[in-house]
Amino acid sequence: MHLTSREQEKLMLFLAGELAAKRKARGVKLNYPETIAYIASHLQEAARDGMSVAEVMQYGSTLLTVDDVMEGVAEMVHEVQIEATFPDGTKLVTVHNPIR
């Protein structure tokens, strides 16, 4: 199987997001890379599920709270940006201050 660099990047993001989700489910507080991967992978899946750009942006701000991440991580994450594949094409999605 041959994957383009973009496909490889999406796959790595998915895997990192899955690892972060498993850790979160076990009650482990997420570090910075895990936090970004968790949010970004959920945004990718929401776009593929057919949500609009506005819905994905709103959804992204509901995924994690300050209690889900290590101390200081919420202050480090000002925004998460991804290129998500929607039914009508690829679009840039930005979620500002995603951890509330």
UniProtKB/Swiss-Prot annotation:
Q: Which NCBIfam families match?
A: PRK13241.1, urease_gam
Q: Name one GO biological process term.
A: urea catabolic process
PANTHER family attached here? UREASE
Keywords attached to this Swiss-Prot or TrEMBL record, sorted alphabetically, are:
Cytoplasm, Hydrolase
- Kindly indicate whether the keyword Cytoplasm belongs to this entry: yes
Q: What is its EC number?
A: 3.5.1.5
- Catalysis: reaction(s): urea + 2 H2O + H(+) = hydrogencarbonate + 2 NH4(+)
Instruction: Show the GO MF annotations.
Output: nickel cation binding; urease activity
Annotated family: Belongs to the urease gamma subunit family.
EC class (word): hydrolase
Q: InterPro entries this protein is in?
A: Urease_gamma, Urease_gamma/gamma-beta_su, Urease_gamma_sf, Urease_subunit
Q: What is this protein called?
A: Urease subunit gamma
Pathway annotation from the record:
Nitrogen metabolism; urea degradation; CO(2) and NH(3) from urea (urease route): step 1/1
Record localization: Cytoplasm
- Major location category of this protein: cytoplasm
